[in-house]
Structures are given as structure tokens and as C-alpha cells.
Amino acid sequence: MGLSDGEWQLVLNVWGKVEADVAGHGQEVLIRLFKGHPETLEKFDKFKHLKTEDEMKASEDLKKHGNTVLSALGGILKKKGQHEAEIKPLAQSHATKHKIPVKYLEFISEAIIQVLQSKHPGDFGADAQAAMSKALELFRNDIAAKYKELGFQG
């Protein structure tokens, strides 16, 4: 299920575009997540009160959290699958503290793909989309395996 060197290069090339504005990309990813899957908003006490897209866009906390999420993901992607050290604490907190189901990680993966498609169409063609989907699936599978070790049925 691993990615080839060429696939990782496609992933990291488009991720370079994300790094020009991590917070902006992260905010847009979270807005898409919450709009597409409103049930996910219930996991975020800090954002539950945000009902409209305008409220979400105006929230500095949402932007800050988007930055946190995509910064962590960027660090994981740069490990090209050798991300055990990064995955372990993330799985621990998301299983025991936040109780985030793997399904929600699928939802945010979809949102990431959609944001990259809309913001970087020239750098995110079919090959790059397939590579990113594969990288995000690898991440989710590894998180799910850690969840299982922790006894979390997410």
C-alpha cells in the first residue's frame, strides 16, 4: 500500500503550495469538513457555536486550529510513510481525549482533496490527486491500527 518515490514527489510538490498559507488552507479544509459533515462539528467544543460559513471564516480560533491540523499532517507527509513517531501521539490524543472516529478522518481527507483541487488545479491533476488520496489512506490506516492497539473502536 506504500507510495512510490514518484507518488511521494507529487504529494510533496502540491504540499509545497499548501505551505505558502497553511492557516488559510487549514481554515478552508475545516469549513468544508463542517459544511459537508455537520456532525463533525460536535467534536469541537470551541467551534460548536459557529453556524454559518461567514462565522467560520471570521473565527481566528478556527484558522489557528486549521494551521495546527495541516502543520501536523505536513510533518507526517514529509516522512513518506515512515511516520510512526508522529502517528503515535496523534492517535493517542484523537482516540482517548478527542474520541475522533476514523470515519471523520476520511471526511477530512475528502475535504483536503477538495481544497487542493479548488486552490491548485494546475498542480493537482489526476496523478497528484491519486497520490494524495493514497498518502491520506496510508495515514488513516496507520491511525486506525493505533486506535485498535489503544482499544478505541473509532
From Swiss-Prot:
Segments forming domain Globin: 2-148
Phosphoserine found at: S4
Reaction(s) the record says it catalyses: Fe(III)-heme b-[protein] + nitric oxide + H2O = Fe(II)-heme b-[protein] + nitrite + 2 H(+); H2O2 + AH2 = A + 2 H2O
Repressor found in the keyword field: no
InterPro entries registered for this protein in UniProt: Globin, Globin-like_sf, Myoglobin
EC top class named in words: oxidoreductase
A Pfam family of this chain: Globin
Binding residues annotated for heme b, in chain numbering: H94
Residues with Phosphothreonine modification: T68
GO biological process terms on file: removal of superoxide radicals
SUPFAM superfamilies cross-referenced by the UniProt entry: Globin-like
Binding, nitrite: H65
GO cellular component, one term: extracellular exosome
Compartment annotation: Cytoplasm, Sarcoplasm
Family: Belongs to the globin family.
Protein's UniProt name: Myoglobin
Species annotation: Tupaia glis (Common tree shrew)
